Amino acid sequence: MRKAPLLRFTLASLALACSQAFAAPSPYSGMIVFGDSLSDAGQFGGVRFTNLDANGNYAPVSPMILGGQLGVNPTELGPSTSPLNPVLGLPDGNNWAVGGYTTQQILDSITSTSETVIPPGRPGAGQVLREKPGYLANGLRADPNALYYLTGGGNDFLQGLVNSPADAAAAGARLAASAQALQQGGARYIMVWLLPDLGQTPNFSGTPQQTPLSLLSGVFNQSLLSQLGQIDAEIIPLNVPMLLSEALASPSQFGLATGQNLVGTCSSGEGCVENPVYGINGTTPDPTKLLFNDLVHPTIAGQQLIADYAYSILSAPWELTLLPEMAHTSLRAHQDELRNQWQTPWQAVGSGKPLSPAAPRTWISTARAGASGDGRGYNLTVGGSYRLNDAWRLGLAGGVYRQKLEAGGHDSDYTLNSYLASAFAQYRQDRWWADAALTAGHLDYSDLKRTFALGVNDRSEKGDTDGEAWAISGRLGYNLAADSSNWQLAPFISADYARVKVDGYDEKSGRSTALGFDDQARTSRRLGLGLQGSVQVLPSTRLFAEVAQEHEFEDDRQDVTMHLTSLPANDFTLTGYTPHTAPDPGEPGGKP
């Protein structure tokens, strides 16, 4: 019987209690845009409906910014029907939005004909500069792995097509029809703006039309949301009116000017009152301090806010689907600590023996495919065993595990406390040995803080939730050397099954950026081969080491169903984390 104190180094699970892996920064194959001037990338000879920068170039619109954040090729984000493209030999892009488009023209650009036509109120109004078949014309199909981005509705109001609640509801339904057409053509992920409050724009603020237009904007959005909820696709609504109202209520938090009329003034002075301080001819020209460039279009500040808002929603699953993985990491760390304890010498038959209290502390950093994070973990394991006879030893163990994970580019912070209990059995006869454990526990996600960029500052949304975990694991091995030998070498096979469930929760702020998440469940089924060895290095010291290779059979992509807490009836499911089939040492597994 071995009675020497033990030193054990397990290569297969080093730092397992704190490591994490990250999903790719974009699961989308591309980005295709439809809409009006709010998203127009330059159909009219490169003109965009936002401010000029310091070099005299047009600032990007929100889908161009979002596409860059998602890693989409800039060429693909360009205009689809610009008359300059064929003249200059430039390829058409995937942005089909055209300034002046009504909801009917947006639908036509998808299903029949895309026209770059001079909008009403402009010189040459009605002249078609270029036309081409619509995106899905001639039987073409949408890309189910691409992100589709849809804006529209404002021009139905500006061009006099909406004069009553019935007109507003019909316009909202027409915009939803564009999303429906994309879904029927094969699109799966469709992001749709809610119409901004037209009463809160320089064009109508302070006029008799302000209140009626605010009410009609709301009717439009109610109709739009109702119709979107009936489409069999992942429809991602953007609550743009709520976001902009937050910016107007607390401008300094968004980098906007304080003490200025952000609704009644604009940057360019084109048709509206130019801001005397930050307008283009003001004392300190700076479009980033203003929300509007002209009567109805946002500056780069507004475009950036909306792009960041959209990205915060799309990127949330890449972090939140790691919550079950944190629990699986705790389970594996607990199982490894049990195996560590099982290397201690067996006590006499009919007697008990406490486990050696263990409280390791570890750190690890990872960086994958543009996402990075740092994890750290602490745990405490206690318990004891009882030897039934020469061949069997039984025991109980409990463990408390605390993990903190910082994820993403803005250091989101997630904390998990795991409370695990195990019953285990060990067997040895001649040179054969085996062990098995059944584990169950409670998961306390006490502090979940998702942090993301929103304009010039970061914003955090907080929540908490609970969960449960259980697992069964076993090993069977054979010692190649006699028990009395100074060295041991034992090949083994292993099998593990674990299941984690994380309860759904809502982030608590009630703001436009707050999200709600449904329950998540993640199962792990692993088989492994390994080699365990030990050597007596000193009379009182034996060194243990282990190497193992496992295969994960549950390697499907992890998705999460979510919703904006401000729009709870419109949920959608987005892509998150994908486990490795063969976890790296020190990781629960993850591949970009």
From Swiss-Prot:
Q: Please, which domain of life does this record's source organism belong to? A: Bacteria
Q: Which UniProt keywords apply?
A: Signal
Query: Can the keyword Signal be found in this entry's annotation?
Result: yes
Question: What Gene Ontology molecular-function terms does this entry list?
Answer: lipase activity
Look up keyword ATP-binding and say if it applies: no
Disulfide bond entries: none
Q: What PROSITE patterns does UniProt report for this protein, alphabetically?
A: AUTOTRANSPORTER (PS51208), LIPASE_GDSL_SER (PS01098)
Stretch list, region Disordered: 572-592
- Gene Ontology terms describing biological process: lipid metabolic process
Task: Provide one Gene Ontology cellular component.
Answer: outer membrane
Q: What residue stretches are annotated with the Autotransporter domain?
A: 334-592
Active site residues of this protein: S37, D294, H297
Q: Which InterPro entries does its entry note?
A: Autotransporte_beta, Autotransporte_beta_dom_sf, GDSL, GDSL_lipolytic_enzyme, Lipase_autotranspt_EstA, Lipase_GDSL_AS, OM_autotransptr_brl_dom, SGNH_hydro_sf
Q: Which residues form the signal peptide?
A: 1-23
**Membership in a protein family:** Belongs to the 'GDSL' lipolytic enzyme family.
Q: What is this protein called?
A: Uncharacterized protein in trpE-trpG intergenic region
Source organism per entry reads Pseudomonas putida (Arthrobacter siderocapsulatus)
